Amino acid sequence: MIRETGEFVINLTTEELAFATDYCGVKSGRDVDKFKETGLTREKAEKVKAPMIAEAPVSIECKVKEIRELGSHHMFIAQVAAVHADEKYMDEKNRFDLNRARPIVYSHGEYLGTGKKLGTFGYSVKKAKKQAKKR
C-alpha cells in the first residue's frame, strides 16, 4: 500500500494502545476495518492521504523519497511532511512528556514500556558536588 501511494503516517503508540497496536500489526486492512474492530478513531491528515489515529499522542505524516529492497522486506526513506502532538502530553515548557504518554517499543516479538528516566544530557561527565566540610 505504501509503495503505491508513496505516503504514510507514523502513529506513536502507548501502553494503553498496545492491544489495538498488536491487532493492527497482525490483521490486514484488506480483510477487516481495523478502526472499527479496535475502536480507534480515524483522523484526517493535513499533508497526506493516509489516516492518523486520533488516540495516538504523536502522528508523523511522511512522504516516501526512496524505497530500498532488503530481501524479505522494504525500507522506506521518507520526508516528514507534518507532525502532530496531543496537547495533553506537553509539559509546562511545551516539551513532549514521555512519562505521561507512556510509549511502547516492539522488539523481537515483544511489546515493552519505555520505563523510567535514566539521566539527563551530560550526566555522564558532570563532576560530583563537593560535600561541605564538617566542623
Predicted ranges, named:
Residues 1-135:
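Basic, polyanion-binding surface patches
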